[in-house]
Every structure is written in C-alpha cells, then in structure tokens.
Regions:
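Active-site-proximal substrate-binding core of FAD-dependent oxidoreductases
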Residues: 282-320
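C-terminal auxiliary extensions adjacent to catalytic cores
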Residues: 320-371
Length: 371
C-alpha cells in the first residue's frame, strides 16, 4: 500500500494544474513545496493568449485577470513600429499570485516541505518519507530531482527581470515589445496591470553576461516615458532549451519548467506549464504515466520544438539584424489571435522579406518549420 496515489513535487502553475485534475478525479494525492506561500515568489509575467486560455480551459475571473489584450506593438530602438489590432480579446495578463492561489483552492498542499530525494516510489522530505504509486516533478528549471535534467547551458537560459511601475495606461496599444540592443537574445516588454501600474521587464540570454537590472535601467533612460515609481520587482530564470523527447521515467512524470515546457521563441511559460501539468494530472488520475508520454510527444512536444527552432534562428542572427524585424513587420497583417498560427506566420514573413534572414534560417537548419 502507498501513502498516496500521486505525489506532486512543486506547487507552481504546472504542479497546481496537475493537482486540480487529480482533485477533480477524486484521487488521493498531495502537493509538496518548500515555499511558505502559494504564488510567491512570482515566476511569471502572467501573459498568455486567448487561444491557450480557451484550449486549456483556464479561468478568466476579473479577480485574477489584471488586463485583457486587444492590441500589440512591436518596435525597435530606432522607432520602427508594427501594431496588430483586433476587435476581440487575444490575450490576458494574469495577476500571477492571485492566479496560482485561485488554482490552489481546495487542493491538498503541504508547504514548508523540501523534497530531498526520490527513489522509485519513495519521496524523502525534510518532514520524513512518503510513498506514492506515481510522482509528478514540477520543481522548476534547475531541479536536481531527476537525472533527465542536465546542468542548463547559459545560452539556453534567459534571465528575466521586471519592475512594476506607477504609470498611466498606454493610450496607443495594450502591450508592447521592444527588440533592443539593451536586451541581447531577448526583448523588453511593457504589460498593463491594475490601478495605474505597468510591468516593465527585460529578458537577456544568460550567456551574454548582461546584468538585466542595469540593462533595464539603460533602456529606461533611452525611453523616459517609461520612468515611474517602482512598486515591486521580480527576477527569474527562463529555460529555453531544446524540449526533451522523453518526460516519463517509470512512475515519474516531469512537467513545467522542469521539462523545458517554455515556448522558447517568446520565453512564455504559462501555457506550457498548464498544458503539461494537465496532461500529467490526467495520466496520473488514470494510473497510466505512459499516457502522458504519448500525449507529450504528439501534442506538446511538436509545438515546443517549433518555438525552439524560431529561437535558434534568433540566436544565429546578429543582434543588429534582429533589430530590423519591426521594420520588416510593417507589411505583416495578423489574421487570427491564435499564436500557434501567428508566430510561425510572422517568422515566415520575416524570412521571405529579408534575404539575410533567409540565410540565417538556412544556417540554423530551420526553414522547414515555416513552409
């Protein structure tokens, strides 16, 4: 006899998403995490497309959604700007702490509990050992609890830093992205929040050794309209490595950032964490871990691989060429709010309208992804 049907290690988005499925299936489960409070520290900007909200049946209650998105701006340091406008919501920005706390309601969670080791069906923690038929590892990008995870290379990690600043809502469009010399391998973002607050953040590839705090400060000096009183900050690592083909090892399932389920082209992790967590939770509820492996390979892995290939092109292209993208996109016309369609369409447009970008895509071995 086992203590639990399933033990979930990690009470972030992926672990909580798996927990919700198990809870609704009436399974005997527990979620273990070393932190003191759900939703803290914040590990996400909270942005996600309408497509994935619908696909994953994510809640959009006003209490947990900071903003709804209908227009997006993409620009560079030279002032080149492309704006995509829609007559319907195409995305949301969650209040991330409230979102995770909403997911956690009613779940069997034990905080202040660090998992030290996992061996077969036994989980060793700082509060003693427990056993489970199945185990879901949702303990983040630097987890040491599975042999699947190698030490991530610096080129496969983005360092994200964000400041929530006192600023009025934008009058031109809802959210903005800058491809900037201040953000090598990444970008700068401006997301709306509640109560005259906006989230100004930056992601830089770790290999660049760029200090994201200093880089965001330098960027702000170039864009003084973004200056505002800082209410709070977040910083976190974002894994953008090649997705693993195998995520199930016997009775152990790997989800979320621990499985590199981040959309590497944008650094967006909320959709991959939710998707992988739900798939693993469903498999665990049916006591069939291999079901998760099959659905990972057929559903999630191909999407993650496409985004990784886009990221690979960006990392092949010199930064000064990346800065040309907003200019090239001036002739791009978005058709849907589905980012599974629009991001590859956008990348194809860039490749077809720039001979040098085509060359870099060929060098990266990624042109087949867009034809």
């Amino acid at each position: 006899m086992f203590d639990y049907d399933t033990v979930i290690v990690g009470a972030g988005t992926a672990g909580l998403s798996a927990g919700r499925i198990l809870h609704e299936s009436g399974k005997n489960y527990i979620i273990l995490d070393s932190k003191e409070r759900i939703g803290v520290p914040i590990r996400s900007t909270g942005g996600i497309s309408e497509y994935f909200v619908q696909k994953l049946k994510m809640p959009v209650n006003d209490e947990i959604v900071s903003a709804r998105i209908r227009s997006v701006g993409i620009q560079n340091d030279d002032g080149d700007l492309t704006v995509m406008r829609y007559n319907h919501d195409v995305g949301y920005v969650y209040d991330f702490t409230k979102y995770e706390q909403y997911l956690a309601k009613g779940l069997n969670i034990e905080l202040n509990t660090r998992v030290l080791k996992i061996a077969h069906n036994e989980i060793g923690t700082t509060k003693g050992n427990v056993t489970a038929r199945n185990i879901i590892i949702a303990s983040g990008p630097t987890t040491s609890l599975t042999s699947m995870k190698k030490k991530p290379q610096d080129i496969d990690m983005i360092v994200g830093y964000e400041e929530t600043r006192r600023l009025p809502p934008r009058a031109d469009f809802d959210i903005s992205f800058w491809l900037s010399r201040h953000a090598p391998g990444g970008y700068v973002w401006d997301f709306p929040d509640r109560n005259n607050l906006r989230r100004i953040g930056i992601g830089v590839v770790k290999q660049s050794r760029e200090n994201p705090v200093s880089a965001l400060g330098d960027f702000t000096r170039d864009h003084p309209e973004l200056t505002g009183e800082v209410h709070h900050t977040i910083s976190h690592l974002i894994p953008v490595a090649h997705p693993p083909s195998k995520v199930v090892f016997g009775n152990i399932m790997i989800v979320g950032d621990a499985a590199n389920s981040v959309f590497a082209s944008t650094g967006g992790g909320l959709q991959g964490a939710t998707w992988s967590g739900q798939l693993a939770g469903k498999a665990a509820s049916m006591e069939n871990p291999e079901m998760y492996q099959r659905e990972w390979r057929s559903e999630l892995y191909p999407v993650l691989l496409d985004h990784y290939r886009i990221k690979k092109i960006f990392y092949t292209v010199p930064n000064k060429k990346v800065l040309d993208i907003p200019r090239i996109l001036k002739t791009f016309r978005a058709k849907t709010g589905n980012d599974l369609i629009e991001i590859p369409r956008l990348m194809k447009h860039v490749i077809l309208h720039s001979p040098s970008m085509m060359l870099y895509a060929i060098q990266a071995g990624c042109t087949r992804s867009f034809y």
